[in-house]
Design a protein with these regions (language model features):
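ATP-binding/phosphotransfer module of carbohydrate and carboxylate kinases, centering on a glycine-rich
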Residues: 1-68, 114-119, 163-296
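Conserved phosphate-binding catalytic cores of ATP/NTP-utilizing and phosphoryl-transfer enzymes
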Residues: 1-4, 99-123, 138
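Active-site glycine-centered loops adjacent to acidic/histidine catalytic or metal-binding residues
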Residues: 13, 106, 126
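Short beta-strand-loop/turn "lid" adjacent to the catalytic site in phosphate-handling enzymes
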Residues: 40, 56-103, 115, 199
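Glycine-rich beta-strand-to-loop/alpha-helix junction loops that act as flexible
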Residues: 76-82, 125-127, 247-257
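Short hydrophobic/aromatic-enriched beta-strand-loop microsegments
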Residues: 101, 124, 141-142, 270-277
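Glycine-rich phosphate-binding loop of actin/hexokinase-like ATP-binding domains
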Residues: 118-169
């Protein structure tokens, strides 16, 4: 790469559960990859930096590189929590051994990866949900304000609605279904256990029921079908918001996004594009510079 002062590009995709690092040469050839623990900077900037450095060290080992090569690395960080300005600045003030680092959100990295570094839109629907459009140098974000106040169209919200319907079925207000019985069996038919569980349940705890919802929907379980219809409507709401901001096609990503497509209306199905790459690919693009979310 002409006039680029570093020898290696490093892409890091960091979320609440894992941190993945990929080292490439300037031609995009992958030299090493590794995965470590959480790198959500809202859960602790120092913890995130430790996970990142560990992942890069493991990837470097695979690439037969040493710490002496670190100053020749330009690192692109696509991290959960980077949208919070105070957390962004606190993280960027930490010392590091690399030649340069660039920090933006995991959604931004995923969007860059999905569209090969060019303008485009994605809707991530996994445990949570978030839509992002990159257009003419601007970043447009819809949703993504986390569970339970946002994240419509996600596994967590779908799981929350499931639990609510199960409790209504116990009270005889709505019909019970095989899916409702499946959930009750999970809790040993103990309503108090569901209530106690709910006091500390995290988004991923609600999201754990998503596979069962899809499975029972194939058996025409009325509760499962209604939950997927509602989730599909939520996803179409986010897609429409991105379209109004200028998106023409949208990549659906995440565990729910990849499975919900058949439940969308035909006009929205026609808007769906296939991602060209993932968030690590986007982070590699970020490593080349000019992708910081805020100004240092």
């Amino acid at each position: 790469m002409v006039d680029f002062p570093f020898a290696y590009l490093v892409g890091v995709d960091g979320g609440g559960t894992s941190c993945r690092a990929r080292i490439c040469d300037l031609f995009g050839n992958i030299l090493g990859e590794a995965k470590t623990g959480s790198a959500n900077i809202l859960l602790g900037g120092e913890i995130a930096m430790a996970s990142i450095q560990q992942a890069i060290a493991l990837a470097a080992q695979q690439a037969q590189l040493t710490t002496a090569d670190y100053p020749n690395m330009a690192v692109g960080l696509a991290l959960a929590g980077a949208e919070q300005q105070q957390a962004w600045h606190a993280f960027m003030q930490q010392p590091h051994p690399y030649g340069a680092i660039t920090l933006n959100t995991d959604a931004y990295g995923a969007c860059l990866g999905a569209w090969g570094g060019k303008d485009g839109a994605i809707l991530i629907s996994g445990t949570g949900s978030c839509g992002i459009l990159l257009l003419d140098g601007q970043q447009h974000v819809v949703g993504g304000r986390e569970f339970p106040i946002s994240d419509q169209g996600s596994g967590a919200i779908m799981g929350l609605r499931l639990i609510q319907q199960v409790l209504l079925s116990v009270d005889g207000i709505v019909p019970s279904t095989e899916l409702a019985q499946h959930v009750l069996t999970h809790f040993d038919n103990d309503i108090d256990a569901i209530v106690s569980w709910s006091k500390t349940a995290r988004p991923c705890d609600y999201g754990q029921f998503s596979p069962a919802i899809f499975t029972f929907a194939t058996q025409n379980d009325s509760l499962a079908v209604s939950l997927l219809q509602q989730t599909a409507a939520d996803i179409e709401m986010w897609m429409q918001a991105l379209i109004l901001r200028g998106a023409s096609s949208i990549c659906l990503m995440g565990g729910i996004g990849e499975r919900i497509q058949a439940w969308l209306t035909p006009p929205m199905q026609q808007r769906i594009a296939i991602p060209q790459g993932d968030a690590m690919d986007g982070a590699i693009v970020m490593a080349r510079g000019n992708h910081n979310l805020f100004v240092r």
